[in-house]
Amino acid sequence: VILGINTGGKKEALTIQVGDNESSKYWLSVLNELKNRGVKDILVICADGLTGIKEAIGAAFPKTEYQRCIVHQVRNTLKYVPDKDRKAFATDLKTIYQASDEKKALLALEHVTGKWTPKYPNSMKRWKDNWDVISPIFKFSSVVRKVIYTTNAIESLNSTYRKLNRQRSVFPSDTALLKALYLATFEATKKWTTTIRNWAQVYGELSIMYEGRLPE
């Protein structure tokens, strides 16, 4: 599922896809479908480390920034950390992604890496490897950052889909599955009637950051 925020500050479920062959070719077809349906521009795409997504974005929407999902980045880091250290480790990770600018974030990254790597050798490798797609977040204010990396809406949808899966574990075809997903999405998105919090401030900042790409 791809969730977007329109220029009016409201959330929209843009597309639902069923596929098991994630690649740059696959994601390019998904993004091109959005273009064909009228999506003219995307400022930022926030996603997990999906195979080929960065290349597909560059081809379909060359001006769009790809931001690695911070929530998934943190989850992947803590995946193999035992409970006794997880809370302290998570608190230290916050010093990276909640830093006021990239320079301070890099200092925090070095500190956290030095502290935890001796105990969990591979835990911080993905942060350094993925820094080019983690770091775009630091040019935004805290208000805009929350819009970009808050996953409440998408997690709510995913929870709806998991509930659907528990109710019926087998679907006779992809078409049957898509129909069920569309109905569940339609019901879930009925509640999306309000604008994003602090949208006027967010819109103003984005208008300056991405000059000429948003309506006056």
Predicted regions mapped to residue ranges:
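Acidic/histidine-rich catalytic cores and adjacent linkers
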Residues: 95-216
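A short, charged helix-loop
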Residues: 18, 77, 88-92, 96, ...
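A generic short alpha-helical patch detector that favors 3-5-residue windows
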Residues: 19-23, 45, 66-69, 81-85, ...
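Conserved beta-strand -> loop -> alpha-helix junction used to position metal-binding or nucleic-acid-contacting
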Residues: 44-51, 56-92
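RNase H-like nuclease fold core
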Residues: 1-46, 51, 55, 60-63, ...
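Hydrophobic/aromatic-lined pockets within catalytic cores
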Residues: 35, 39, 58-62, 82, ...
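Short, conserved catalytic/metal-binding motifs centered on acidic residues
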Residues: 11, 45-48, 69-72, 127, ...
